[in-house]
C-alpha cells in the first residue's frame, strides 16, 4: 500500500514585484517554482518543491518526468533515505549538483511529506528534534537597493521580530559595500547578528 503509483511535476513562473539583484547572478525578474507530487497506491500524496532564480526550471521538470519519476514508480516510499541515495546514484553519471540536485530536492521533500502524513507527526519530530523552534534570520536580494531603501527593509525585518539579518554585497566599488555594511550595523546595533552574502563574487583581496 505504500508503493509509489505515480509522480508528477509542474513549473510555475512567479513574477517579482520589482527587479532584485545580486553580485553573481545579476537581475532577477521572476523566480521559478518546481512542484512535485508523489502519489501512493493507497491514495496518499506528498508534495515538495524547489525553486530557481529564473533559469533551468524546464530542465528540472524534464529530469523528474523522464528520469526520476520512472525510477521511483513502483518502489516502496517508506525508506526515504534509501530512495534519496538511489535517486542520486540513478543519475550520478550526469551529475550530483545543479539540475539533478534541484530535481531530487523536490522529490525528497515530497517523500518526507508522505512519511510525516503516514505517521501523523510534524517534520521536526520525525527528524528527532527536541524543539519546535529554530534560529532564523531575514534577508533579501537587495544589492540594487539604494541605501535608504536597504535600511528601511532592515527596519522591517527587526519589526517582524528577527534578531539576525543578512544583506547582499559585491558592488563594483568595495567602498560602497563598506558604506552599506557600516550603515546597517549602526542601524541594528551590536546585539543583532549580521551577515553579508557576496554570492561568490568577491576575490580574496576584497
Regions found by a protein language model. Give the residues of each.
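N-terminal capping/lid subdomain adjacent to the active-site entrance of alpha/beta enzymes
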Residues: 1-195, 199-205
Amino acid at each position: 500500500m505504500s508503493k509509489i503509483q505515480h509522480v508528477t511535476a509542474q513549473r510555475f513562473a512567479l513574477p517579482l514585484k520589482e527587479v532584485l539583484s545580486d553580485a553573481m547572478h545579476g537581475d532577477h525578474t521572476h523566480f521559478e517554482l518546481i512542484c512535485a507530487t508523489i502519489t501512493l497506491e493507497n491514495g496518499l500524496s506528498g508534495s515538495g518543491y524547489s525553486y530557481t532564480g529564473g533559469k533551468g526550471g524546464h530542465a528540472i521538470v524534464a529530469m523528474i518526468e523522464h528520469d526520476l519519476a520512472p525510477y521511483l514508480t513502483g518502489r516502496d516510499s517508506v525508506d526515504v533515505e534509501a530512495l534519496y541515495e538511489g535517486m542520486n546514484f540513478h543519475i550520478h553519471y550526469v551529475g550530483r549538483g545543479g539540475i539533478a540536485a534541484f530535481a531530487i530536492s523536490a522529490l525528497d521533500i515530497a517523500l518526507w511529506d508522505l512519511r510525516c502524513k503516514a505517521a501523523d507527526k510534524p517534520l521536526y519530530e520525525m527528524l528527532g528534534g527536541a524543539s519546535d523552534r529554530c534560529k532564523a534570520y531575514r534577508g533579501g536580494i537587495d544589492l540594487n537597493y539604494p541605501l535608504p531603501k536597504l535600511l528601511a527593509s532592515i527596519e522591517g525585518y527587526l519589526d517582524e521580530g528577527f534578531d539576525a539579518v543578512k544583506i547582499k554585497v559585491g558592488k563594483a566599488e568595495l567602498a560602497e559595500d563598506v558604506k552599506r555594511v557600516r550603515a546597517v550595523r549602526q542601524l541594528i546595533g551590536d546585539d543583532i547578528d549580521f551577515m553579508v552574502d557576496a554570492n561568490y563574487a568577491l576575490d580574496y583581496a576584497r
